[in-house]
Structures are given as structure tokens and as C-alpha cells.
Amino acid sequence: MIQQETRLRVGDNTGAKELLCIRVLGGSYRRYASVGDIIVASVKEATPGGVVKKGDVVKAVVVRTRKPIKRPDGSYIRFSENAAVIINEQKNPKGTRIFGPVARELRDRDFMKIISLAPEVL
């Protein structure tokens, strides 16, 4: 459950390390984002020489949340951190690698490129 001012780890190799959620996209008064939702975020921490710099405003898709996600079969999945992957306007990842596991719910939202790059899909 991601909302404004939430800080997230970055799960790709764009050079950003931490993001701050500015806005949850989808509806005029939408408050929370979960796995597979797109957010607008500011880069708060970045490595030198990366694709994105500190202070850049980017779009990102949430790939892991600490809030448990209920699945249709009744099971829940929860991760140890909140993480997002920076995407471009075509909803493809800006980076070339994805770090850490991602949730299966991304497949339903048509983020197939992220699914294929991820080392593990839970």
C-alpha cells in the first residue's frame, strides 16, 4: 500500500536507489497503490553515472509491497520491502536488469518485459 510521501527502493539498474512517491495514477482522488500500479515519483538517492539523476521526476510501477496482497485462491503474498521499477512512457522498464523477486500480479497488468527480466516471479 503506497501513498504520497512513501519512500520506495528501486528494483532496477537505472542508477536510482530510492524514490519518493509524489502521486498515485488512476483516478482523481486515488490514495493507495499496490503491486502493478503506476506512480509518479521523485528520485531521492542515486548513484553517479546512472540513467536518472537525483531530483528527476519519473514514472514507476510498484513491484513489491510490505502490505500483504490477497490472491484469488485465498493465499496472501507479502515482501520485506516496498520497491518499484522505473518505466518510460511505453510502460517498458528504463533499466536493463531487474533485481529481486516480483509479484505475479504484474502479468495481469501487461508488464511482460519486467516479468521476463525478473530473476524470480512469486
From Swiss-Prot:
GO biological process: translation
Stored SUPFAM superfamilies: Ribosomal protein L14 (SSF50193)
Function, in words: Binds to 23S rRNA. Forms part of two intersubunit bridges in the 70S ribosome.
Binding partners and assembly: Part of the 50S ribosomal subunit. Forms a cluster with proteins L3 and L19. In the 70S ribosome, L14 and L19 interact and together make contacts with the 16S rRNA in bridges B5 and B8.
Keywords: Ribonucleoprotein, Ribosomal protein, RNA-binding, rRNA-binding
Organism: Heliobacterium modesticaldum (strain ATCC 51547 / Ice1)
Originating gene: rplN
PANTHER family: 50S/60S RIBOSOMAL PROTEIN L14/L23 (PTHR11761), LARGE RIBOSOMAL SUBUNIT PROTEIN UL14M (PTHR11761:SF3)
Protein name per the record: Large ribosomal subunit protein uL14
CDD domains: Ribosomal_uL14
GO molecular function terms noted in the UniProt entry: large ribosomal subunit rRNA binding; structural constituent of ribosome
Superkingdom: Bacteria
Pfam families: Ribosomal_L14
Keyword Ribosomal protein: yes
GO cellular component, one term: cytosolic large ribosomal subunit
Family indicated by similarity: Belongs to the universal ribosomal protein uL14 family.
InterPro entries (alphabetical): Ribosomal_uL14, Ribosomal_uL14_bac-type, Ribosomal_uL14_CS, Ribosomal_uL14_sf
